[in-house]
UniProtKB/Swiss-Prot annotation:
Name of this chain's protein: Elongation factor P
Pathway annotation from the record: Protein biosynthesis; polypeptide chain elongation
Family of the protein in this entry: Belongs to the elongation factor P family.
GO cellular component: cytoplasm
GO molecular function terms listed in the Swiss-Prot or TrEMBL record: translation elongation factor activity
Keyword Protein biosynthesis: yes
Role played: Involved in peptide bond synthesis. Stimulates efficient translation and peptide-bond synthesis on native or reconstituted 70S ribosomes in vitro. Probably functions indirectly by altering the affinity of the ribosome for aminoacyl-tRNA, thus increasing their reactivity as acceptors for peptidyl transferase.
One Pfam match: EFP
Any single biological process term in GO: peptide biosynthetic process
SUPFAM superfamilies membership: Nucleic acid-binding proteins, Translation proteins SH3-like domain
């Protein structure tokens, strides 16, 4: 068990018998009065956010999750099905995928995250390349400064088409690189 003062962003801990990932940590107090830690967390089983305040000496079990490389196979409403190298299939509920929904594409390789033997979510590669399926053309005269526009990118389920802010020179059918952690455009891979 670790005290709250040793827990870092990204650690997975047990809170009320539920696995929670720490998304943000704010420290308040002083050495005289004692420190408190305000954490923004997410329940890994239900994907619901939660905020709570803990004292520095509160203790938590740190959880180590298993991960396995998988390939996205298909969508069977409301489940997304992934397959590993041995052709085992893992079903993950839509709400547990979070922002990964925006980037999933048939045949995409990622890592399934397991808790207690059950696949609960996936981790995507940090950067991915996606084709722009729709983008407004650049407006003449609107090219000064760092002007951005929205571009819709391809993915497996059209209902989850996602937009990314891109520079004006990016056009429809371009393939762009995106950072999946921040949803930021990185560069054009292919015109």
């Amino acid at each position: 068990m670790k005290p709250a003062k040793e827990i870092r962003v990204g650690n997975i801990i047990m809170v009320d018998s539920k696995p929670m990932i720490v998304l943000r940590s704010d420290v308040n107090g002083s050495s005289r009065t004692g420190f408190t830690y305000k954490w923004k967390m997410k329940n890994l089983l239900t994907n619901t956010p939660m905020e709570n305040v803990f004292r520095g000496d509160d203790k938590f079990d740190v959880v180590v999750l298993d991960k396995k490389p998988v390939t996205y196979s298909y969508f069977a409403d409301p489940l997304y099905v992934f397959m590993d190298e041995e052709y085992n299939q893992y079903e993950i509920e839509e709400e547990n995928l979070g922002d990964a929904l925006h980037y999933l594409k048939d045949g995409m390789e990622c890592e399934a995250v397991f808790y207690d033997g059950k696949a609960i979510s996936v981790e995507l590669p940090i950067t991915i390349a996606r084709q722009v399926v729709y983008s407004e053309p650049a407006v003449k005269g609107n090219t000064s400064g760092n002007v951005l526009k929205e571009a819709k990118i391809e993915n497996a389920v059209e209902a989850h088409r996602h937009t990314v802010q891109v520079p004006l020179f990016v056009s429809q059918d371009d393939v762009i690189e995106i950072d999946t952690r921040t949803n930021e455009y990185k560069r054009v891979v292919r015109n």
